[in-house]
Amino acid sequence: MCIYQVRKDDWENGGERGTELTLDTAKAILDTTAFEKPRTTEALPDFLEQFAGTAKRKKKLSQSAAETGSPHTLVITGAGLRAADLTRALRKFETKDSKVAKLFAKHIKLKEAIEAAKKTKMGIGVGTPQRVMDLLEDGALKVKGLERIVVDASHIDQKKRGVLDMKEIQVPLVQLLGREELRKRYGKGEGKVELLFF
């Protein structure tokens, strides 16, 4: 099953081939239709509690790995301001040993974000696709302990666009979700990564 397709031309800035980048992740997508509350900023903590805390292998939402820069949950959204709002909403899961980390570009330079990720024990990271990829490329952010990726799909911006409608976000989002280190763990037993659409 293909959940999203982006023409290769779109992300190669005028490449000659019209090949499509497809992401086959049907086994990783967790059915969240049982969530009965409106999918608002304030409801995200309840959403995570309902769908992220059931299996034995999973860390509690307020825990983090011993290694810095290694969240169990990544929340991916389309804009820095939205990421800041979601970060505030998720603070209830923050402890002195486990932070809810900001992983977005708005007012935070990449160098500063890299330094912060390398020093921070985070349970949850909230950010934009491109910044998360930049941190992964640097090695400041690690996915070894990652258990789930939550895509903020229900939020609609002032221009009436969702994260899957924004061309400037579509390509980085598909590239992020299609990264080899994630793709090979989608829906596969021990150490699997689940995809949740909020």
Q: Residues of each region from the PLM?
A:
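P-loop NTPase motor module signature
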Residues: M1, T33, K102, H107-L110, ...
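Conserved motor-coupling elements within RecA-like helicase/translocase cores
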Residues: L110-V126
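Post-DEXD/H (motif II) to motif III coupling segment of the RecA-like Helicase ATP-binding lobe
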Residues: A140-V151, I156-F198
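Structural recognition of the conserved hydrophobic beta-strand(s) that form the central parallel beta-sheet
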Residues: V75, I124-G127, V150, L195-F197
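Conserved helix-turn-beta segment of the N-terminal RecA-like "Helicase ATP-binding" lobe
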Residues: R88-F104, A140
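Conserved helicase motor
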Residues: T77-G80, A101-E112, P129-R131, S154
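Low-complexity, highly charged intrinsically disordered N-terminal segments
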Residues: Q5-R91
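Conserved catalytic network of the ASCE P-loop NTPase/AAA+ motor domain
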Residues: S64-T68, F93-T95, A116-K119, A140-K144, ...
